[in-house]
Structures are given as C-alpha cells and as structure tokens.
C-alpha cells in the first residue's frame, strides 16, 4: 500500500510538470529528457534537437487553452535580434508532450518574398500586374504577435465586412483585398477572413458569436486559436 502511494505521488509530481516551465525547458535545457516526456507521435522525434537558446535571443511560452483530448495546448515564440521569429504549437496531456505543429509548407511563400525584395522596380511592377500581393504574403508569414496586432487594429473593419458580406459577397471581397487578405467565406457556420496559405495550411481570422461554437484545437486541423482581446468575437487561427 505504501509503495502504491509513493508511486502515485511520484507520478502526480511528474504529470504536474507538463506545464509552461516544462515546455520552456524543452527549448532551453540541453539535458531535457525527451525519452521521459515525449509520447505518441513525438516518440519519432527523440533524436531531434529542440535546444534553441543558441539560435534565438528570446523564448516565450503561453498556454492557448485545452481540448477534450489535450490538457494543455501551448504557444512557443522564438525570436532573434535580427527579426527572425518562429511560432510553434505544442499539444500535451498530463503524462507528456504528444505533438508539435507550425504553419507548414511556407517555403514557396518565403522564396517569393525574398525574390520580390531583390527584384528591380520593373520586375516588381510586373509581379504586381500578375496579381502578386506582397503584403498579403508577408501577412501569411507574420508572427502571431504581429497578426494579433493587425487584427486588433482592423477589428472594426472586420465587423463591417461581416455585415457587408450578408448583403453583397462580391463587394465584401473587394474590401477584403484592400486589407491584403485573400477572401471572406463561411466555413461550418463560422465567418472567416482568410489571409492565405498553401493547401490546408491556412492562417486567418474567425468570427465566433458564441464560445460554444468555437472549434477545438488539435494537431490535425486548428493548430492554434487565439482571441484578439477578452471581449472580442474575433480569433486568429491557423490550420493544417
């Protein structure tokens, strides 16, 4: 009986560590024990090196929420002084870390932006004439912090678009383009302003009237959801 109680205590202490501190240590502790904490699909990444303190100057971890499957869903922000940043999303249960996601298939977007930045003015004009919206591409790759700021600054316009879309979808999507977004649409009854992405790897803003209608985050669809502000009906989202 005593051994069982001791084991239960040790296991509860282990589970309790799957929190902000544990997620932070994955990226800052060279001796992080992946064999203990990596579960599910993360077992395939035991040989991966997650230590990032030598590559990034700032590492922040915040809890985005939880779901019926995961007790903790975390946002990890890695940033360097040269402006490079990376947003990661970690899915954990009480006994360990089960999945890690980020916005995928961004290589072609990065290449287009890099090519545009070194192009001549004539070439840039040609690309714009072909329909390339470089500001839209930059928004797709923007950090979550920058996207949340963009969303807050334009929330009133988002609401106007929501109203306009009910009356005239074509007119609404013309306004959407002026905001450097891709398009407006309804998906499963929720109004979305899509910034863009490749195939199913999309970033955008979602309007949710009732929190009960908010989709659950998961490694297989909505990899992140974050409200613009405490009383906002708008959420930043990313999918995979």
Locate each region found by the language model.
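Short beta-strand edge/turn micro-motifs at domain boundaries
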Residues: 86-125
């Amino acid at each position: 009986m005593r051994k069982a109680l001791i084991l239960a205590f040790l296991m509860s202490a282990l589970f309790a560590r799957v929190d902000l501190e544990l997620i932070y240590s994955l990226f800052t502790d060279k001796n992080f024990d992946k064999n203990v904490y990596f579960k599910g699909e993360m077992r395939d990444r035991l040989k991966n090196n997650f230590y990032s303190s030598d590559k990034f100057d700032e590492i922040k971890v915040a809890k985005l929420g939880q779901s019926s499957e995961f007790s903790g869903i975390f946002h990890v922000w890695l940033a360097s002084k040269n402006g490079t940043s990376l947003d990661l999303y970690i899915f954990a249960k009480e006994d360990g870390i089960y999945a890690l996601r980020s916005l995928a298939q961004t290589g072609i977007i990065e290449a287009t932006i890099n090519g545009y930045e070194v192009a001549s003015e004539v070439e840039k004009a040609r690309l714009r004439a072909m329909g390339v919206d470089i500001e839209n591409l930059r928004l797709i790759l923007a950090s979550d912090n920058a996207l949340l700021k963009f969303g807050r600054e334009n929330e009133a316009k988002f609401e106007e678009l929501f109203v306009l879309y009910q009356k005239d979808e074509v007119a609404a999507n013309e306004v959407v383009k002026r905001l450097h977004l891709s398009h407006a649409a309804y998906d499963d009854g929720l109004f979305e302003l899509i910034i863009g992405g490749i195939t199913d790897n999309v970033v955008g803003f979602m309007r949710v009237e009732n929190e009960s209608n908010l989709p659950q985050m998961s490694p297989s669809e909505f990899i992140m959801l974050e409200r613009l502000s405490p009383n906002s009906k708008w959420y930043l989202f990313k999918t995979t």
